[in-house]
């Protein structure tokens, strides 16, 4: 990890640089890993550490960065470096982390029929009542113009709910002469090209919501040889959806009723449906209990479906699309990472903070599902408690030099197990 940070460029005037670039990145990571929520709170913690007899937070940041800084930098100094660092460099680190996990086979258990599940979806990362920058997207609401920023994310997901970013594409207005705003459908080909370049031979199944149920997206998946499971709704493919429900009643042999825990599931599938020149299988799942509560989902896929695979594809494939929303976006917005907070007024720096947040989230997921997994369940319990204990440890307990020594850590391999 440190050699990736060492390779980052530094455009600052070198004769006047006080804080090492790696120290800057670890300082930014500590904002998210301590759930501080802002640069201002980071400054308060730096002042508190300087007032103590022993400066444990400073020593630990130096230990992690391999530096010998004399004090913790101010949040504005951190922002200066991230303003000068082109965001394309930090953008490469989250997918490199995933590549490393794949090479050490730590994520093999997460495959579904040999395929890694990649969820692609967009989320808002900032909303403003005034124009924030020239890249802002705009939307009229109640007669007023809302300015906002959007990012299209691709995350590799695991059965127990871990999410790792493998690609990000910011949806933003970059051409002043354009007659249309950028949108997530337009951003998808850009994101897909990045993923294919970084993971050219990775066996992938993409999970997408109904917005992407169209000819262009299916053609894109075919071009990159990606399998797909896409939400299937009448509002997006009305003709194919009507045909699916008509044929479903004529194929009773393609229906399976099963029970999972206290709920029943009725699953049906119809092969050889068509949209334009794309053929696919439609399948759905009606989940209900003894009290009459019902939940309905439907999907389309190019994967082979039968009575042996439909339960797995529905429950561990199609329904897992929500992982990016629940364990990804919601956690990053509300569990202490404060994804929607404006960490910088500079657009380039804001992107860098976004990528650093993805790195911090990945590191903490590996920690809570790996080294301290047992203690997390039995003692810590919640992420809120974890952030409190982690921050307390970072401020008051010195990290062993051996724990961050590259030579000592080289033989270590991460092993995760399904829950």
Predicted regions and their residues:
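Domain-level cores of phosphate- or acyl-group-handling catalytic modules
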Residues: 178-239
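A short, flexible helix-boundary coil/loop motif
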Residues: 8, 47-49, 57, 254-271, ...
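Gly/serine-rich nucleotide phosphate-binding loop at the start of the catalytic core
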Residues: 1-70
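Short, conserved catalytic/metal-binding motifs centered on acidic residues
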Residues: 27-28, 42-43, 74, 114-125, ...
